[in-house]
Every structure is written in C-alpha cells, then in structure tokens.
Amino acid sequence: MDFAISLPDPGLTAAIQHRIDRKTKPLGALGRIEALALQLGLIQQTAAPRIRQPHVLVFAGDHGAARAGISAFPQDVTWQMVENFLAGGAAVNVFCRQTELALTVIDSGVNHDFGRRDGLVDAKIAPGTANYIETPAMSAQQRDAALARGRELAHALAVNGCNLVGFGEMGIGNTASASLLTHCLTGIDLATVTGRGTGLDDAGLARKHRLLAQALARGGRPSDPLGALAEYGGFEIAMMAGAMLGAAEKRMTLLIDGFIVTSALLVAQAIAPAILPYCVFAHRSKEPGHTAQLAHLRVEPLMELDLRLGEGTGAALAFPLVQAAANFLNDMASFDSAGVDDRV
C-alpha cells in the first residue's frame, strides 16, 4: 500500500519567520510557540495558518494477549470504556469539551457489539486480535484492511474541512503491543520500552516481561513495519497508523498523544518517513518507553505532565497551545502596525 506524502515545501520559511520576528516582542521571546507557529505555517503552506474543524479520533480494539494476564485490567474494560466515551464521561471527553474539540470513537476491533451509536464509527476488523504469544496477531489481509480504513477516516475528515487531528486509543493490553512494536522498529531493548501500563505491580510487570519474551521467541523481531504490525500490533494501532498516513497525505497537522499513539506513528513513519514534519508531539508520557520513542524520533514534546492514561488526553490538553501558535501568528500586532519602536 502506497501513501503519497510530500514534505512541506520549505520555500516559505523565511517569510513566515520574518512575520514571527516582526511581532511586538523580542526575538524568540515566545520560545517554542514560535517554532510551532512556523511548523503550522509550513504544513499549511501559508504565513497565516488557521486551525479548522479540529478533531480527536480515539481508536479502540481488543488484544488476544490480554487474556494471558498481560494487563492489570480484564479485557471487558475496553468495551466498558468505549461506553464511557460515548456517554461523555471519560477524561478525554472532559478535555475535548473544554477546548471545543470534536471527538469520535472508532471501533477498530473491540470484542463487543455496540450497535449503531452517535459518536461511534463501526470499523471493526475482527472482535480482537489473536494472541501473539501463540500466533501472529493479525493476518496480512486484516492489517491492510485496518490501514486502508484508517486512511479513509482521515480523508473523510479532510473532506469535511478538518485540518488538525489528534490521536487517542483504548485497548486493554495495548501497551504491551506498543512495547513489542517499538522494540522491533527501533532496536531499543525490550525491557527499556516495557512499563507498568495501566498499573501493574512488580509481579505483574515481571509476568509481562516473561510473556513478551515468549512472544519474541515465537515471532522474532521483524524490522519492517508491515511485518511487525502483523506479528504484534492491535487493530486500533494499525488503523491509527493508516489514519496518520492519510492525514499527512491531506497536509493535516497530526497531534500525537503518548506511548501507544507514538508506536502507531513509528509504524507510519517507517512506511513513509515524510510524515514526521506534520506531527506535533503533545507530551511526554510517564510510561518509560515513550521517552525512548521520542529520543529515537529526535523530537521534543510540548508538555511533561506525568500523564499515563492514553485516550488522547495529552493531545486534547496540548491543543490550546497549538491554537495559541496559530492565533499569535495571525492576531498579534507587528511593530509596524502597532507603531512600536523596535530599535535595540
């Protein structure tokens, strides 16, 4: 599957930077907000970028390996949390309402029948992946279907005028899948990128390490993104990667959440490296593997709040900073318009 992603044309860099520098402030005084404004301008190819119809997509899916005790919570919590999202009661709902972000939940592969519901897209590939400790998590056909469906979802948002999408996820056991994918695609030691997830105690963490070692003994360490995704991925991770790639094809800004979302980005970036300039990294998760992922990508997140919830909460919390970067570039007076002396 080919994705047509073009790198942002750097030809506008000087013009956008000049506009930033002429605002009524010392050079660089707004720090990383200035860098973010430049990034938005390059993504949108304008010196006056605007955020339109921003949207958070929360991808949900179940993992066969969860039944082996790889998580602190039972698998049923996946569908129960989807119900919580649909009822508006989760943390991501609260933060999206606060910032007037639209929120849609994507059933990528939850082991539950939700029926037709407002705010839910039924994109179920299957009711959960296979147990990757025993067999590949998904077939090549399932993987490709998930990638394609994610791409379609992003393109549909673009048609409706959206130019910024935040990514979130829900799936009991998906931190383990993210650890395996990160290990495969970066070569970072598995122990370094394996943490407590939803709150494993010491015994649970030791069990998680054993189970992931068993998975690797069976499936090896495929370094190609499609192979790694089929062996160890989740349907929500695969569909999210497809949506990221589709969003970048449409020159949308991608607001990246924490550890699991970044594992999907590692897949997407390995497929199409040109995706990276479209990404804004919301925060640094407390999950230890996230710091390793960010270092591998050589990026710095906007915030460090010790978050480890997922759901897209970090993306929703970071959105006002992205909006502020666009607003500053468009609405702040320049030395010329304000009649302020800029001589040093």
UniProtKB/Swiss-Prot annotation:
CDD domains: DMB-PRT_CobT (cd02439). GO terms for molecular function: nicotinate-nucleotide-dimethylbenzimidazole phosphoribosyltransferase activity. It is an enzyme of class 2 (transferase). This is Nicotinate-nucleotide--dimethylbenzimidazole phosphoribosyltransferase. Its EC number is 2.4.2.21. The active site is at E311 (proton acceptor). Catalyzes the synthesis of alpha-ribazole-5'-phosphate from nicotinate mononucleotide (NAMN) and 5,6-dimethylbenzimidazole (DMB). Gene3D superfamilies: 1.10.1610.10, 3.40.50.10210. It catalyses: 5,6-dimethylbenzimidazole + nicotinate beta-D-ribonucleotide = alpha-ribazole 5'-phosphate + nicotinate + H(+). Pathway: Nucleoside biosynthesis; alpha-ribazole biosynthesis; alpha-ribazole from 5,6-dimethylbenzimidazole: step 1/2. The gene is cobT. PANTHER family: NICOTINATE-NUCLEOTIDE--DIMETHYLBENZIMIDAZOLE PHOSPHORIBOSYLTRANSFERASE (PTHR43463:SF1). It comes from the Bacteria. It comes from Aromatoleum aromaticum (strain DSM 19018 / LMG 30748 / EbN1) (Azoarcus sp. (strain EbN1)). InterPro entries: Nict_dMeBzImd_PRibTrfase (IPR003200), Nict_dMeBzImd_PRibTrfase_bact (IPR017846), Nict_dMeBzImd_PRibTrfase_N (IPR023195), Nict_dMeBzImd_PRibTrfase_sf (IPR036087). Signal peptide: none annotated. The keyword Glycosyltransferase applies. NCBIfam families: cobT_DBIPRT, PRK00105.1. Belongs to the CobT family. Keywords: Cobalamin biosynthesis, Glycosyltransferase, Transferase.
